[in-house]
Regions:
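Bacterial N-terminal signal peptides that target proteins for export
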Residues: 1-8
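Internal amphipathic alpha-helical repeat/solenoid segments
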Residues: 42-85, 90-112, 117-133
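C-terminal motif of bacterial Sec signal peptides marking the signal peptidase cleavage site
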Residues: 17-19
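Hydrophobic, glycine-enriched assembly/anchoring segments
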Residues: 379-410
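Short glycine/serine- and small hydrophobic-enriched flexible loop segments
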Residues: 87-94, 143-154, 214-221, 286-293, ...
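Mobile, glycine-rich extracellular loop/lid and propeptide segments
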Residues: 77-80, 99-107, 135-150, 155, ...
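Inward-facing hydrophobic residues that define packing positions of alpha-helical scaffold repeats
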Residues: 90, 103, 148, 164, ...
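Extended ligand-binding clefts on enzyme/binding-domain cores
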Residues: 25-47, 51, 76-80, 115-120, ...
């Protein structure tokens, strides 16, 4: 018995020094809790990845021996948003070649090599890499850094790409921009919050869908650049911002807001209107889910938010709710178009993010929302509209979350 106790103690010590001290999280498999088999879950994810990255209607296209881009097919262009999302799918799915190809295309064609924007990325390009818009969108750089740090965690830095070095270089670029020549970093340093774009005009407001506090905590843990305390401060500020941006009754937020969470007025040519819940906003429920799963620093508010948001959607019918709203949950005053269509629809992208929020709450609609997502297919709508890009990527992200496969460690 004594020798057994000694062996047990040694095993416990070894465990604490090796795997048991790894700090790896356990990730909830919501689909399995609903009774779906692991084989069914894996097949569901693989079918979605096949549609977006491999099928004839795919968004992902390889170029030459070592590059690839993720196309916004409906708009026939390439965006930093899509490149960064493709990289996130790749690191989550352990597809290193795909990750490296997308990052190489991004560095080759999108990165500014000189001038005031040097080190930032043109957010909007053609399939051949020529720039449509020279400006940057802060969410692209935000995701790129996080993608690279996660890649460093998963694959190390001894391959053909030093992911940590590239992340550190981009971070140094961000914090070297001080407004000279109209270029700022992606963080408004007065509010310590992410801005809409890194320029002196767009630095004055933000987009709630850019706020993923847990990403900043990944930066704090892995960037090794001496800014860990700042990143944790931004994460905390971002959570408080979301409290203000999401309507206290409906949970709905506007696409673009002040740093106090108030909707801003958008202007397009001769038209101007107050920002509402449009396409960008679809991401917010899933972003908050990500922070809930990875960090758990604001669970009480996040659970209340998820309950409000899901109830607002379910009030229209779980299989019917539209994809754009006013903040009070009513019909939007202005319908935002996409891909040549301007109509409200029951979009799989919003269903996906709404279902992901079931991980934060357990109301009478949560399980049915996930079952409804499971029953849906990523395919063209009756009017011919099809968004394999945005709908498709949000759908994949949601499947990864709900299966316990959207992770920050492995």
């Amino acid at each position: 018995m004594k020798s057994f106790k000694v062996l047990a103690l040694c095993a416990a010590v070894l465990c604490s020094l090796v795997s048991c001290s790894s700090g790896k999280k356990e990730y909830r498999n919501y689909f399995k809790e609903l009774g779906y088999s692991q084989e069914e879950i894996d097949a569901k994810i693989q079918a979605a990845v096949h549609e977006v990255f491999e099928s004839e209607r795919r968004a992902y296209h390889e170029v030459g021996d070592d590059m690839a881009y993720v196309a916004d097919v409906k708009n026939r262009d390439v965006r930093t948003e899509g490149q960064s999302y493709g990289m996130m799918v790749a690191v989550q799915m352990d597809k290193q070649d795909m990750f490296d190809r997308i990052w190489t295309w991004t560095k080759t064609y999108m990165e500014h090599k000189e001038g005031p924007m040097k080190g930032f990325f043109a957010w909007h390009c053609r399939y051949d890499g020529t720039h449509i818009d020279e400006g940057s969108a802060s969410d692209g750089e935000f995701y790129f850094v996080t993608d690279l740090l996660l890649a460093s965690r998963r694959w190390g830095n001894d391959g053909k790409i030093n992911y940590l070095a590239d992340a550190q270089s981009l971070l140094n670029t961000m914090f070297s921009k001080d407004g000279s020549d109209g270029v700022t970093g992606i963080i408004n340093m007065d509010y310590k919050l992410i801005n809409f774009c890194p320029d002196t005009v767009s630095n004055r407001w933000t987009d709630p869908s850019y706020h993923i506090p847990a990403f900043f905590e990944v930066w704090a843990e892995s960037a090794q650049d001496g800014r860990a305390d700042l990143y944790r401060e931004i994460a905390a500020n971002s959570r408080q911002f979301l409290h203000k941006a999401c309507n206290e009754k409906t949970g709905i937020n506007a696409d673009q807001t002040t740093f106090d969470g108030k909707p801003i007025t958008r202007s397009f040519g001769q038209y101007s209107f107050v920002s509402q819940f449009w396409y960008d906003s679809w991401r917010v429920p899933m972003n908050i889910t990500l922070d809930y799963n990875w960090s758990g620093a604001d669970k009480e508010w996040q659970s209340e938010y998820a309950d409000k948001f899901q109830r607002t959607m379910a009030s229209y019918g779980i299989e019917k709710f539209p994809d754009q709203f006013n903040l009070d949950g009513g019909a939007p005053r202005t319908i935002m178009g996409a891909g040549g269509y301007r109509t409200l629809r029951h979009s799989i992208g919003l269903v996906a993010t709404t279902a992901a929020a079931s991980m934060m709450t357990d109301n009478e609609y949560s399980k049915d929302l996930v079952r409804h997502l499971w029953s849906m297919k990523l395919e063209p709508y009756e009017d011919g509209y099809y968004d394999v890009y945005y709908d498709g990527l949000l759908y994949i992200f949601s499947l990864l979350h709900l299966s316990g496969n959207y992770r920050m460690d492995w």
